[in-house]
Each structure stands twice: as C-alpha cells, then as structure tokens.
Amino acid sequence: MAVQVVQAVQAVHLESDAFLVCLNHALSTEKEEVMGLCIGELNDDIRSDSKFTYTGTEMRTVQEKMDTIRIVHIHSVIILRRSDKRKDRVEISPEQLSAASTEAERLAELTGRPMRVVGWYHSHPHITVWPSHVDVRTQAMYQMMDQGFVGLIFSCFIEDKNTKTGRVLYTCFQSIQAQKSSEYERIEIPIHIVPHITIGKVCLESAVELPKILCQEEQDAYRRIHSLTHLDSVTKIHNGSVFTKNLCSQMSAVSGPLLQWLEDRLEQNQQHLQELQQEKEELMEELSSLE
C-alpha cells in the first residue's frame, strides 16, 4: 500500500524581479556556489472538494473534503556575504539569519504585510540542479524551525549537448523523512514565476548590492592571506596581482553589465514618462475643448 506524503507547502510563487536578482547572483561566479535568503509570506488557502448525490427532492453531501493549500510568496531576496568560499557547499551563519529576520521586519513595516524569511537559495555551477545529500539535510534542519521553509537551487553554466548553448535550470524543494530510514529525501515543490513590468525598490537595491558584496568577499580573502607572516615578498606581490585580477574580472562580468542594464532601464523610463506627459497634454486639450 502506497503511503501518501503530506507536503508542508504545495506551491511557491516567485516574483520575477526577485528571480532576476537570484539569476544574476548565480551567474556572478562559476567557481564557487553562492547563496541568499528569500523574503516573503506564507498564505493558507482553503480548497473545498464536494460530491453530491440526488435522492428524490433533497440533495445531500456524500463526501466533502477541505484542504488547506499553503503557498509561499517570495517578494525579495537578500544576497549573503560568504565568509568561506567552497566549490561544493555553502553555509548560513546564525548572524546572517538574524540580520535577514531584521530586514524582513523592516519590510513588513514598510509594506504592511507579514514579511519574514521563507526560504533560501544557492547555485550549482556546472552540476545538476537536484539537491545533494548535504542540501537535503540542511533543508531538513531549517524545516525543524519552520515547516514552511523552502529551498531553491539554480543550476548554471550548463551546456546543452545538442545545441551547444548554455542554459539555466532551477528547482524548489523540501525535505521529508524517508520511509523506514533515518535519512531525508527531497520532495519537489511546484514553482511559478509571477511576471512584473517593473522591478521593485527592494529587489533593485539587492541587485545594486551584488557588486559590493563580491568586492567585500575578495577583500576579506586577500586580507586573510596578506596577514600571514611567513609569506615572502614575491608571494605577496603575486597575491596582490591575483586580487587585482579578480576585481577587474568582477567589474567586467558583473558591474559593467549591471550599469548598462540600469542605464537602459533609465532611458526606457524617461521615454515612457515623455509618452505619458504627451498623453496627459492631449487629454487636457480634449477636456478644455469640451468645456
């Protein structure tokens, strides 16, 4: 007899501007995994499925089932600063979770909505989109604190063998206890991208913050190496050159395209503003002619 698994969350709705920030963050480096936290709200929706039978002049319910659908709405993300760069794993410190909770409270006051930390995301450069055993165990740990907590993975720098073009895959998951085992296994959660015409202020601030965070990570790594006393002068010069090279690469791959995108967006907004002003003038002329 098959055992039906009860999911804590039935679906995830990810705002397109938050999706854009996640994607830019995942594509910022192909050597190590990156990560961040998702800010949003968890809504409960009631779904009623009823079956009726008709006997003579009365209609009565044979079976009525009330299901509570839990949907996670992700409105923005917080890009986390990595204290330890690893190729195959990422970790969230308690200090980062606390700072994210404080930011969620600030957003809740601004929007008047019950914002909180509802999940986390990280990248899988050059590897499959499916979570590893470490990812599943980490997700299970977060769910012990919050059953509605979800995990997102962005697999990037993957090349299609047939078309020879790059592609990005993403998935959302939670962890469940495996049958007759102490281990955990993943369960996939349907994820839907909610389209937006404009990018929100909070997501725009996160996108602008990305180059700063990447620069801070490089500075921290360089300072740790530079503080070692046993290094000779040639090694220190080499480390300085590597540091400069990494910063230039970030400017070329992240800061430059981001600046160009912001300038293009500004030009589009100015053009749209001119069109609206022209439309306003035409409407005012029509209104004055009617008077």
Curated annotation (Swiss-Prot):
Its main location: nucleus. One of its GO terms (biological process) is cellular response to ionizing radiation. Gene3D superfamilies: Cytidine Deaminase, domain 2. Its EC number is 3.4.19.-. It comes from the Eukaryota. Transmembrane segments: none annotated. Its cofactor is Zn(2+). SMART domains: JAB_MPN. One of its GO terms (molecular function) is metal-dependent deubiquitinase activity. The modification N-acetylalanine is found at residue 2. Zn(2+) binds at residues 122, 124, 135. The keyword Zinc applies. Pfam families: BRCC36_C (PF18110), JAB (PF01398). It is found in: Nucleus; Cytoplasm; Cytoplasm, Cytoskeleton, Spindle pole. It is an enzyme of class 3 (hydrolase). Binds 1 zinc ion per subunit. InterPro entries: BRCC36_C (IPR040749), JAMM/MPN+_dom (IPR000555), JAMM_MPN+_peptidase_M67A (IPR050242), MPN (IPR037518), MPN_BRCC36 (IPR033860). The modification Phosphoserine is found at residue 233. Metalloprotease that specifically cleaves 'Lys-63'-linked polyubiquitin chains. Does not have activity toward 'Lys-48'-linked polyubiquitin chains. Component of the BRCA1-A complex, a complex that specifically recognizes 'Lys-63'-linked ubiquitinated histones H2A and H2AX at DNA lesions sites, leading to target the BRCA1-BARD1 heterodimer to sites of DNA damage at double-strand breaks (DSBs). In the BRCA1-A complex, it specifically removes 'Lys-63'-linked ubiquitin on histones H2A and H2AX, antagonizing the RNF8-dependent ubiquitination at double-strand breaks (DSBs). Component of the ARISC complex, at least composed of UIMC1/RAP80, ABRAXAS1, BRCC3/BRCC36, BABAM2 and BABAM1/NBA1. Component of the BRCA1-A complex, at least composed of BRCA1, BARD1, UIMC1/RAP80, ABRAXAS1, BRCC3/BRCC36, BABAM2 and BABAM1/NBA1. In the BRCA1-A complex, interacts directly with ABRAXAS1 and BABAM2. Component of the BRISC complex, at least composed of ABRAXAS2, BRCC3/BRCC36, BABAM2 and BABAM1/NBA1. Identified in a complex with SHMT2 and the other subunits of the BRISC complex. In the BRISC complex, interacts directly with ABRAXAS2. Identified in a complex with ABRAXAS2 and NUMA1. Belongs to the peptidase M67A family. BRCC36 subfamily. This is Lys-63-specific deubiquitinase BRCC36. It comes from Mus musculus (Mouse).
